Every structure is written in C-alpha cells, then in structure tokens.
Amino acid sequence: MTHEEHHAAKTLGIGKAIAVLTSGGDAQGMNAAVRAVVRVGIFTGARVFFVHEGYQGLVDGGDHIKEATWESVSMMLQLGGTVIGSARCKDFREREGRLRAAYNLVKRGITNLCVIGGDGSLTGADTFRSEWSDLLSDLQKAGKITDEEATKSSYLNIVGLVGSIDNDFCGTDMTIGTDSALHRIMEIVDAITTTAQSHQRTFVLEVMGRHCGYLALVTSLSCGADWVFIPECPPDDDWEEHLCRRLSETRTRGSRLNIIIVAEGAIDKNGKPITSEDIKNLVVKRLGYDTRVTVLGHVQRGGTPSAFDRILGSRMGVEAVMALLEGTPDTPACVVSLSGNQAVRLPLMECVQVTKDVTKAMDEKKFDEALKLRGRSFMNNWEVYKLLAHVRPPVSKSGSHTVAVMNVGAPAAGMNAAVRSTVRIGLIQGNRVLVVHDGFEGLAKGQIEEAGWSYVGGWTGQGGSKLGTKRTLPKKSFEQISANITKFNIQGLVIIGGFEAYTGGLELMEGRKQFDELCIPFVVIPATVSNNVPGSDFSVGADTALNTICTTCDRIKQSAAGTKRRVFIIETMGGYCGYLATMAGLAAGADAAYIFEEPFTIRDLQANVEHLVQKMKTTVKRGLVLRNEKCNENYTTDFIFNLYSEEGKGIFDSRKNVLGHMQQGGSPTPFDRNFATKMGAKAMNWMSGKIKESYRNGRIFANTPDSGCVLGMRKRALVFQPVAELKDQTDFEHRIPKEQWWLKLRPILKILAKYEIDLDTSDHAHLEHITRKRSGEAAV
C-alpha cells in the first residue's frame, strides 16, 4: 500500500457515520465483530454508533442509539452473547416501524448500517434499504426532516455479517458462532461418553439448528456417532430396522456405548418429525438397551467464543467497514462471508434467495437439491460421514493393498482422529491397514502391527498421539526401512505430522534413486501446533493450541484487570513460525505480537512501551504482549520483560509467562477433529487411486514426483501437491514456508490495538456472486 493509499484509508470515513446492531438469536463472536467495526470505523475517521437491543433500538431511538468510543469495546472480545443486546422486533416488520427507524438514523446523520444477525435480520435490512428513498420522502412530507437532512442521507449502505450458531446461511462456509456452539456440544458429548461407557448406555442427543443439520452432522463426525438424523437427508423408510441392526453390531464389536445425534428439525421421508423420545422408545422396545435422552438446548448459545469465532468476527468486522465506506448508491447490499479461509463479499439478496431455496426444496421433499444448495463444505461432511458410519468393511481382502499409517514430529491434537479415519476408510476400501509406532524410527525397527476396525474406536476425541511419534528422519535408516517395507509388503504410506513429516517425505523421494523399495506412493497430512508445513494454510492441531493459548490469555487479562497498570509478556510456541502468536494476539486482543517473520528493532520495542504508557492513561489499565519463542535470538522474553520493567517504572509493572508444552496437549477442538477426519479420508481415497495407477507386473512401482504429496488446505480447496514442487517454497533453515497467508492479518491486529499503521487487510475482497452447484459436480 502506498503512502497515498494509506492516507486514503485513514480518511476514508471522515464525515461518515456507521451504526452497528446485533439482531435475532445471539451467537458467540458477535462481540468480536462489534469491537472490530467500532475500532476500524474510528481508525478511518468515521463516527460509530451502537444500536442497543437490535432493530427494536433502531425503532425506539433515544438512548438506544449511542456513540461508541475506542474504550467502550474493551474487554468484550472474550464475552459470549452480544454486549449491545439483541431482540426479536415486530415493529420493524411494519412500515410504520421502519419509518421511525429511518427518522432516527437521518437525525443522527447515519447512512451506513452494519447488521450482525441471521437470515431474517439481513432480509429485514435489505427491505429497509430498498424502501429508503420512499421513507425519506414520507418524512419530508410530514415535515419531520428538512430537505437538507434528506439530501445528506440520500442513500443507505448496508452490510450484513452472519451471526448464527446454526450455520444455516448459504454463501458462507462458517457463520459467526457456529464453531463455539460446536465447542459446547463436544464438551458435553465428551462428558457423556464417560458415563455412557461406565453403564453401557445408549445416549440420544438433541442439538439445535432449526431446519439446518450442520451442527448435528459435524458433531457426529467429530465424536464418531453411530447415527445422525438431519433434516436435509431423511433416513430410508426402513430406518428403524437399520438403526437397531447398527447399534447391536457396534455392541458385538465390543463397544460399550452408542451415541445417536438428532437435529431438532429432523424429519422422515414424508416430512413427519423424528423426535429424540421416538428414538429412545424404539431402542428400548426393540433392543432393551438402557437409553437416555439429553436435549442440549440453550447451552449451545452460551459460553466463551472460541478462537476461531473471535478471529472470524474480527476479520468480518474489518471487511464490513471497508465495504460500507467504499459503498456507492449503486452497490447492492452485501454480506461479508467466509470461503475456505478468505473473506469475500456477496450480494445479500442472492444469499438470502439461496437460503430460501433450501427451505423450499425441503418443503417440496427435494432433499438432494437441498443438500446441494447447502454448499460444498456441507456435502463434504455428509459424504465422509456416510463412508465412516454406514459402510461395513468387506470380509474378504482379495485384490487388496497394504497401506501403513504413521505419526512423525511432535504430538498435536487431532492426530488420532486423522489416524482413525485413514484406517477405517482404508478398511472400507478393502485394504490391509498397518499402523507404525514411533514414526520413521518404528518403521526402521519394525514396530508395525495390523489395525482392525475397532483398533481405532473412540480415538477421535483423544489428544496427543496414540501411535507414538518421534522427530527422527528416515535418511539414516533407509536400509532397515526398505527391508521392512518388503517384509510387511507395504505399498503405500500415510504420514501424519509436522515439518519432519514433510522433510521425511523429501528424503524418501531422494532415497528412491538408491532403493527401489521406497518407490511407493506416500502422502503427508500436516499435523503440528506450529502450522509451519509448506503446502497448507492450516495444520491439524493448530486450532486446539490456539484455543489453549486464548483461554490462558483470557485468565491472564482478568488478573491484569484486577491489579490495574500491569503488562503481561507471554511466550508462545511455534518454532520460527509466528502463526500462533499472531492469531492468538488477534483472538485475545493483544497489544503486540513479536514474530520472526516480521523483523523488529529496539525502536519498535520502545514504540510499544510508549504505546502502553499512553494506554495506562485511559480507562484500560492493562497490557498483553505475545512473543513467539524464536522471534529473535537476542531480544528474548527475559530481555523484553526487563526492558518493559525498566521503562515502565512508576507507570506500570510487568510480568512474564512462558506457556510451554501445555500448548501441545488437551483434547482436540471440533475444528481439528473434523479437519483431521476429512483429511484422513481424502488422503486414503487418493492413496487407493495412486496404488492402482502404479501397479505393474504384480508389484507397485511409483517414482513420479506426483506419487509423493502433501495434502493441504489452500484458500478454498483441499489440494495434493508434490513434495518436490514445494521445495522452492520452503525456508529450510527456519523450518517455515516462504509465503504465509496469515501475515496479511497482522495489520488488523495492530489497528485493533490502536496503532497508526497502513490498512492493507489481505487480498482485497470484491463483490462476487454465489456459484450454485450443478447436480453432476463432485464436492471438493
């Protein structure tokens, strides 16, 4: 961004006013969005107003519409719900109510409205916008506003952010609040699992989501449920028979519990509701199992927002302000949404229309159509769920291949979920699946055993690495590894791990020249808390680590708020990769995050101290600074602590905290469980294809570059990239990719912490259109 453009961003909002409101059901992460809208709005020179109690406040006016300040949104990032209140409003549905709302906005000179809510709230906003000029002329005729006021407010810009735990809005992969709701559900499922196992019980869990089965579907994927009922895919007519058969099969395989997940809107093929009580009675009557029903209810809306929702809310809030301030009378009302990990702007009414089309398709019992309209990510989840839950592994292993699965590097939450789905998809495809203990070292020593279906039972929710993992690389023991590949007849290798898994893959590629046995296909699934594997925007385990850091930072901020005038310096893990420090800084509202990728000098440290000195003069008397463990070999955590302590004498005192290995532990978050499960399934499907491709004269021979890949999430899709091609994109000395997408989020972190900097927020989002899936297209 040039100096001129930076100046333009700083003055973009001068003379403009933005109102922000939250409407409809509350969702965790709404506060992060409100905070970002307020702070970025103020940064650009605009005036920002809170509208309390949703549309009701807009209609009532008066004290419900208050100007926001920088400090008024402090300490709200970690709160659930919405601080400015929300209400379902009948008045706004009537034209009379909208007329009063228009009057309240015009009188304050507000022409930009940011609405955070579900599809109903956003549709209401669009109606309001389309009537705007008529409402103004009515107000003029009635003499309530002057001609000058009418000219000044001649058009209304509207941007919507989707805040809803149901994830039922088409056009965005994730709505604000969905991830946190999944956190609440998984906490409960994990807790129920232990009691169910003790008593050999069957639990029927009912989750929220109205007419959208997203929460139920992802929950069942993340906890390995026996059955899921969702409105988009009603079960076949003989489902009672099928369900009971499945439950008794899992029991005979040795499982001590059954879990059935029911979406609150679940129906059968004829549109008749299927309730949790119906299911309980069926299981008790036919199988005689001890069965309990748990309806989760409003617990799902509560609690602290997850790191994902805080970052999502913050990113969406920034993009919303930019969309509002760049708006003209001709730009349609848009909604800021997430596609893959990119912020995009979509026309509001297109999204609302597709969302309505889903309901219409379901009313007309066109369930396939409804499923397609839900989008790529929903279809993906459904396909993987069906594979893992519904298909029985074939008994005969004729024509099967042998695939080995291993963990390499440091433990990361979600590794076990990836192993589980890899093993099970392998078995479903009729392959023999071996598991290797202790990484490449175990492969050399022959610590290899065959895994059956129940070997990986209940692994999804367990943290760490059950197979055992080591950082050892294969090069030193190629001879033993080759011997074991031959001995166990291994024809494909799935390597789940961090940077060592990737470098190990490169070494295997090199070794193919000397050892023919190494000419087998392999795929690397990135799993490391550091998120430093080239070829993927995300690694399995990073989300769990991020949430752990976030929770700790919240507690530390609380302690600092109590003692006043205190600055905490926190050291995070990640090697040379600053992902955890940056993202945790964004999610916890840090004042600064020092990372290796963005070199800093003593002058920068000095500037940060001065910034904190200024901050102590405001009502917010606390500071939080994150430092990545290897950001600078001389400016260590101790050095920064000593510098802050000395420079802050008499103004603030400092404390330091090194988080350490707690960041590798904990049970995996819903995101990591789901991501790992999908990656495992995708990797195994690729592997089966590659083995068939490389099968010649009765043996496997794969020596092409594309037979050794990293499976990674790139912007909007999961892609396989040959390890050899990724070599040029890697900084091997510092074990990081040369280009990292999240660096573009750093300016947001600084602006939200009140630094005067350039506003270049990632790849600039332009208005796009919804791409509808044709029936023949495969889900990515």
Swiss-Prot record:
The keyword ATP-binding applies. Residues 402-780 are annotated as: C-terminal regulatory PFK domain 2. Beta-D-fructose 2,6-bisphosphate binds at residues 471, 528-532, 566, 573-575, 629, 655, 661-664, 735. Keywords: Acetylation, Allosteric enzyme, ATP-binding, Cytoplasm, Disease variant, Glycogen storage disease, Glycolysis, Glycoprotein, Hydroxylation, Kinase, Magnesium, Metal-binding, Nucleotide-binding, Phosphoprotein, Transferase. Gene3D superfamilies: 3.40.50.450, Phosphofructokinase domain (3.40.50.460). Changing D543A: In GSD7; Italian. The modification N6-(2-hydroxyisobutyryl)lysine is found at K557. The modification Phosphoserine is found at S133, S377, S667, S775. Pathway: Carbohydrate degradation; glycolysis; D-glyceraldehyde 3-phosphate and glycerone phosphate from D-glucose: step 3/4. Changing G209D: In GSD7; loss of activity shown by complementation assays in yeast. The active site is at D166 (proton acceptor). Allosterically activated by ADP, AMP, or fructose 2,6-bisphosphate, and allosterically inhibited by ATP or citrate. Changing D309G: In GSD7; Spanish; complete loss of enzyme activity. It is found in: Cytoplasm. CDD domains: Eukaryotic_PFK. Residues 391-401 are annotated as: Interdomain linker. Mg(2+) binds at D119. GO terms for biological process: canonical glycolysis; fructose 1,6-bisphosphate metabolic process; fructose 6-phosphate metabolic process; glucose homeostasis; glycogen catabolic process; glycolysis from storage polysaccharide through glucose-1-phosphate; glycolytic process; glycolytic process through fructose-6-phosphate. Its EC number is 2.7.1.11. Catalyzes the phosphorylation of D-fructose 6-phosphate to fructose 1,6-bisphosphate by ATP, the first committing step of glycolysis. In human PFK exists as a system of 3 types of subunits, PFKM (muscle), PFKL (liver) and PFKP (platelet) isoenzymes. Homo- and heterotetramers. Phosphofructokinase (PFK) enzyme functions as a tetramer composed of different combinations of 3 types of subunits, called PFKM (where M stands for Muscle), PFKL (Liver) and PFKP (Platelet). The composition of the PFK tetramer differs according to the tissue type it is present in. In muscles, it is composed of 4 PFKM subunits (also called M4). In the liver, the predominant form is a tetramer of PFKL subunits (L4). In erythrocytes, both PFKM and PFKL subunits randomly tetramerize to form M4, L4 and other combinations (ML3, M2L2, M3L). Belongs to the phosphofructokinase type A (PFKA) family. ATP-dependent PFK group I subfamily. Eukaryotic two domain clade 'E' sub-subfamily. HAMAP family: Phosphofructokinase_I_E. This is ATP-dependent 6-phosphofructokinase, muscle type. It comes from Homo sapiens.
